[in-house]
Amino acid sequence: MPEQGLISQFKFDKYVNQIYRSVMPNGCYDDENSIIDQWRSLNIDYVICLCPKSEFLRKAAKEQDDIYGKHYKYINYPIQNYKCPNDFSDMKNLLQILHNLLENGKKILIHCSAGIGRTGLFLSCFLLHLGYNSQDAVSITKTNIIKSFTNPLQNQYFIDFHKYHNDLNLCQ
């Protein structure tokens, strides 16, 4: 069971009350099927789903459009469970979209199945995107999502993304 409840604010010194992490709606961790109501109470504007559509359908027993389409704008960025994104540039582009939405005052919710592994990886990469060093990004993520950074493959992706991100910044 995910720690810190089914939904929690991702807290750091920027974008206060704008970034949330969550379990998948209607999935195995949302046993009361109440997560969507919690999202509504927070006035979430956008959802970033990190699950492939096939995983979402299998675990939530509904299509994403059936759950999100009526209430939320959403972005699907599929990452296989316990795996990593395939492309650094796609990740960088999505992080920039997230950054732009937050700069425009939008409330964003990010989730995978349990809201831990892929969600923690994504949010730690976002902190790098914002200019945090890797040690602070890991520390902030672990403070917010206690069981994050336990997957060696995702840990290596974070290290490699950090190098990619720094190389891009040197070229600009």
Language model segments and positions:
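Cys-dependent protein tyrosine phosphatase-like superfamily
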Residues: M1-L109, L121-Q172
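Conserved G/P- and acidic residue-centered "switch" motifs that form tight phosphate/ATP-binding loops
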Residues: G115
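Conserved SAM/SAH-binding loop-helix junction
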Residues: R118
